[in-house]
UniProtKB/Swiss-Prot annotation:
The gene is bglX. InterPro entries: Cellulose_Degrad_GH3, Fn3-like, Glyco_hydro_3_AS, Glyco_hydro_3_C, Glyco_hydro_3_C_sf, Glyco_hydro_3_N, Glyco_hydro_3_N_sf, Glycoside_hydrolase_SF. Belongs to the glycosyl hydrolase 3 family. GO terms for molecular function: beta-glucosidase activity. This is Periplasmic beta-glucosidase. Keywords: Glycosidase, Hydrolase, Periplasm, Signal. The keyword Electron transport does not apply. Residues 1-20 form the signal peptide. GO terms for biological process: glucan catabolic process. PROSITE patterns: GLYCOSYL_HYDROL_F3 (PS00775). It is found in: Periplasm. The lineage of its organism: Bacteria, Pseudomonadati, Pseudomonadota, Gammaproteobacteria, Enterobacterales. NCBIfam families: PRK15098.1. Its main location: periplasm.
Amino acid sequence: MKWLCSVGVAVSLAMQPALAENLFGNHPLTPEARDAFVTDLLKKMTVDEKIGQLRLISVGPDNPKEAIREMIKDGQVGAIFNTVTRQDIRQMQDQVMALSRLKIPLFFAYDVVHGQRTVFPISLGLASSFNLDAVRTVGRVSAYEAADDGLNMTWAPMVDVSRDPRWGRASEGFGEDTYLTSIMGETMVKAMQGKSPADRYSVMTSVKHFAAYGAVEGGKEYNTVDMSSQRLFNDYMPPYKAGLDAGSGAVMVALNSLNGTPATSDSWLLKDVLRDEWGFKGITVSDHGAIKELIKHGTAADPEDAVRVALKAGVDMSMADEYYSKYLPGLIKSGKVTMAELDDATRHVLNVKYDMGLFNDPYSHLGPKESDPVDTNAESRLHRKEAREVARESVVLLKNRLETLPLKKSGTIAVVGPLADSQRDVMGSWSAAGVANQSVTVLAGIQNAVGDGAKILYAKGANITNDKGIVDFLNLYEEAVKIDPRSPQAMIDEAVQAAKQADVVVAVVGESQGMAHEASSRTNITIPQSQRDLITALKATGKPLVLVLMNGRPLALVKEDQQADAILETWFAGTEGGNAIADVLFGDYNPSGKLPISFPRSVGQIPVYYSHLNTGRPYNPEKPNKYTSRYFDEANGPLYPFGYGLSYTTFTVSDVTLSSPTMQRDGKVTASVEVTNTGKREGATVIQMYLQDVTASMSRPVKQLKGFEKITLKPGERKTVSFPIDIEALKFWNQQMKYDAEPGKFNVFIGVDSARVKQGSFELL
């Protein structure tokens, strides 16, 4: 039996040798061995012990660690989240091993979305890299650091397709596109779980939020979703399935209702689709407090009814409430919930614990007690090099008039803006165990880059916002946004004075961390007025103006696009954000990021996304017609389209060549272009391939991303980029909900973004 690193564990196991030998050992991590083990264990468990396995407790004011330890002793807890130090986790696992009857280990989970202690760019930023190697880096480092803290599971990746930037949680996902979100999520699952979630430095993933949470009406958090089956399965479901096909061991159930039924009580979603059609074998976990919310949804009469509905629908674990532990015993006794249903849920929980290797070693992610870090936040535990490399790839160059960028590391540079020196905000939302004072701000990054070669003048210039209502909201639980005691005009005057003395102005503007988060939906997606006033004043100085955007959603930037000489979209870039942004500003790194989500011109354009349907009256800007699908007071397309991003060099793409004008159902067609770097710098770009089903049994999108490749070329260098197309790329869910490809013409578009493309076509026979 593997040595368990705790005196308490050794004593408790010695007291019950037969049980210990049966429960812990070198168990093969195979489905067959797992099923036999769990079946045997279930026979030994009481009803209360089974129910205890279904309870997922959040450490916090309502559940302090001391109280949780008592619950653990009584077998009332199956898993813990929101504790992230080895010492705390070890103490809780010790309680299980020393005091509970069956000694079934706990698992420990946390929201490790874009890093654990080293914070990487938010998921929108990571998606902007269009680089799966970058995703793998983030996944492996995040898993390493999470496991090194003793964690077994992460509530990630978030693969909700989002086409509404009003939604605050758009920052957590990979953007508007089904294909990109699917492949990013799949890659993240594989990277985090490694060969096995039981490995020392791997963690189990939990794909979320199932399902269609990114389509909430009005972009309003926790709102309802109503859509056709075709749209659901063509656009929103594939990323979840991709993550599960990649091996994710868990699914977090969404808070929203879908077509009138809350996901938490939707047996069609959680059983018919997830279990029966997709063959999912892992656990389903409710979102925070979602089971009790069934009463407010109006699909449960009282707490007991909510528990009955949720468990029967297929929710295995109840997060952050006591409903299962309080009401399941009575429901079992009355027969309203069967023992078979309870056993199914308990089996799923025990299965993932087995897959995590916890029945081989409950301390597998803790290591010896002597190895616990003296300083949990020690600098040596960070992965700064990897964070900087990924952050550079996440930066998108939106504008560069007259080659304003890259900047010179000489002269005088004014760095202004409320986000220029904010260590907290550069990390973004869901920054896990990241520590703000370890992050590098844009101001610090610029200072590091220029050294003594240039003079840096800094002025805050404005508050994030002067709207008291918004400030009060952002500061509801803590002082997240600090308001400068000076008047707005005094702050602008200081910034203008700095600008007048400078050769160039770098203004760092956008959103605070809390403005792009859960429960942070916005009806106005412009930069706050306080910062817009600052930008206008800086523009009036006549000095070259570079905007560095820090935000977690697309912003409406029509005016700023007119005012700025250069614009960098940096999202929330993480621990090394400031250094990475400075690398791009000064040309030490040539930007190659591309937008994973369209930027609307105004909130009135929402939703604006590239893969829309053509309609019967499509707008043609070359042949204006009043009676077409358009706005009369705004341009039809987005300000910046999906896939868009500039470089310090230029690229040309040749016409599309196809290996054949026709394709058999069991064959392939290869589409190719030749890409040339026509500029003076080495640079990378993302070549994107889109398909259009021209005529089908139902209207199909004008184009859909089906492949991409990031390439690096030296000046004058050429490269042929090829994309194989098979039948899977052509399939869709039709009106009869049959997943198939239909014969006919298909257009192929290849280019550097979704708008600038070259076209070819072939026929599926």
